């Protein structure tokens, strides 16, 4: 019995170390290397680089691990994460998650179509609304690892949706939910929904 208890405690302890919580204060210094593309506070000034500010820790951590492990290809980040430990990545994720994402503006001509897709999906084609995973306000569900979209650059969102549709981005889990959704979006759909997301808050 005692051996079982000790074994259990050791296992729990090791698990806790393997999934150590991120330290936002420590992450600020470690995130300096990210600033050139993503902005010092995670609000990227360049529309092709995603805003990381206010993004859920779980999502950020998964993306960094996927990029580091080669499960998601981002040419601009090649080699940048190689020498960072799991704790470094957790700290960086915690720092960016603690920041506030800035909000952009949607193209007025695309708002109606974008909102209809985001809130209603394309039911006839079996595409669910984005709100189910990303919430009506676009903040996502951090605990489930569903990303915060509201305020994200339209250029970046459009690129990701296109990559999911074309199969060049595949790190959306075993269910391939984003690939199946993006497959039902036309170029015009992607432009409208991406613009709507940029202005969503």
From Swiss-Prot:
Heme c 1 binds at residues 34, 37-38, 77. The keyword Ribonucleoprotein does not apply. Transmembrane segments: none annotated. GO terms for cellular component: periplasmic space. Heme c 2 binds at residues 130, 133-134, 178. Keywords: Electron transport, Heme, Iron, Metal-binding, Periplasm, Signal, Transport. SUPFAM superfamilies: Cytochrome c. InterPro entries: Cyt_c-like_dom (IPR009056), Cyt_c-like_dom_sf (IPR036909), Cytochrome_c4-like (IPR024167), Cytochrome_c_Oxidase_Subunit (IPR050597). Its main location: periplasm. GO terms for molecular function: cytochrome-c oxidase activity; heme binding; iron ion binding. Residues 1-20 form the signal peptide. The keyword Metal-binding applies. Gene3D superfamilies: Cytochrome c-like domain (1.10.760.10). Binds 2 heme c groups covalently per subunit. It comes from the Bacteria. It is found in: Periplasm. Diheme, high potential cytochrome c believed to be an intermediate electron donor to terminal oxidation systems. This is Cytochrome c4. It comes from Pseudomonas aeruginosa (strain ATCC 15692 / DSM 22644 / CIP 104116 / JCM 14847 / LMG 12228 / 1C / PRS 101 / PAO1).
